[in-house]
Structures are given as C-alpha cells and as structure tokens.
C-alpha cells in the first residue's frame, strides 16, 4: 500500500527542497515514489491571488496529485499536504468570496480524505536561513506565524506527527524513518 509522506511547515521552510531530496534518495535505493507538483506554488508563480483563496480548488488539485500515483508507488511525498487547506481556509475565511463558503463541512471533508490514507506526518521546524519571497504570498514573519498555525491545526485535529528540525541532515533523517 502507498504511504503518504506529508511535509508540514510554513512557506519557505524547505518543504519542496526536502521533498526533492527525499525523492532522489529513495529512487537511488530503487524505491518507487512520487513527488506531485505543489499546486499553490503554481498559483504563486502565476500570481493568481484569487485562486489561492479558493481552498476547494486548491484541495482538488493537490488531491489529484495523490490520485494519479496512489497504488503505483510505495511513497507519495507531499510538500503541500491536503491538511494545509484547513490552515489556509482559516487564513482567508471571511475576506472574500469564495473563501466565505467553506465552513465545518469543508473541514470534515478534508479530514476524511486525509484519514483515508496511510500517512507519515512530519512537522519541519524552521532554522535561520535564506527566504525567497518571490515564490510566496507571505513574508518571513508571516511564514513563522503560519508555522505555529500549522502545528496548532495538527494538534486540534488529533493528527499525529513527528517533528524534525530543518538542517543539513533532514533528508537523511527522514529516509531512515522510511527504510
């Protein structure tokens, strides 16, 4: 059965780089894995500010990345786990349509989908380093706030996770958990 590796952390913490490193290391060990594209980053590069506020749209596209390789690989590595739709829905809720549409039923759907999978949830802890605002909607300070919001969302929804500090050995530390 396919295991989902969810990398959690705010923008700029290194999720995409770590996901790429994990994909490389696992494939070098002849372990089948996939690292679907990070749909919110596509929206950021396209400067599509309205679409990022539509978390149903984001969720559907992120989930499609899982569906296309589920059952075909051993691991799917996500640098934008679907649970993040709960965090960003709350961030944009009440600001404008369509974010105002998504309430508790949306939350339940996101959690139900997440819970259907065999997940390894990894919360990345930010260390000092560079931050590229060109690929983001948030500043470094806003990203640090989101780090806390993400952890609070995991705790609030009783989602178990492992905490790993981001550093030179992060990829190797995660690989050791998997193989």
Name the predicted role of every residue range.
Residues 20-64:
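Conserved substrate/cofactor phosphate-moiety recognition/catalytic segment
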Residues 37, 78-80, 124:
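Active-site flanking residues adjacent to catalytic metal/cofactor-binding acidic residues
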Residues 15:
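Conserved lysine of the Walker
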Residues 7:
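Hydrophobic anchor at the beta1->P-loop junction of P-loop NTPases
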Residues 12:
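Walker A (P-loop) phosphate-binding loop of P-loop NTPases
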Residues 93-169:
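A glycine- and Lys/Arg-enriched "phosphate-lid" helix/loop adjacent to the NTP-binding pocket
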Residues 48-97:
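Conserved nucleotide-sensing/catalytic segment adjacent to the nucleotide-binding pocket
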Residues 1-4:
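Phosphate-binding P-loop
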């Amino acid at each position: 059965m396919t295991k989902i590796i969810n990398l959690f952390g705010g923008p700029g913490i290194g999720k995409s780089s770590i996901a790429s490193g994990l994909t490389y290391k696992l494939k070098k060990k002849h372990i089948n894995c996939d690292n679907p594209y990070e749909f919110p980053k596509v929206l950021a590069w396209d400067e599509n500010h309205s679409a990022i506020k539509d978390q149903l749209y984001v969720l559907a596209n992120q989930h499609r990345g899982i569906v296309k390789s589920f059952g075909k690989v051993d691991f799917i590595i996500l640098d934008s786990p679907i649970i993040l739709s709960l965090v960003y829905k709350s961030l944009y809720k009440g600001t404008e349509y369509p974010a105002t549409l998504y309430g508790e039923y949306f939350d339940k759907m996101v959690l139900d989908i997440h819970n259907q999978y065999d997940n390894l949830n990894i919360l990345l802890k930010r260390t000092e380093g560079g931050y590229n605002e060109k690929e983001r909607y948030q500043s470094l300070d806003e990203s640090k706030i989101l780090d806390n919001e993400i952890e609070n969302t995991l705790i609030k929804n009783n989602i178990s996770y492992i905490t790993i500090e981001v550093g030179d050995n992060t990829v190797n530390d995660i690989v050791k958990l998997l193989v």
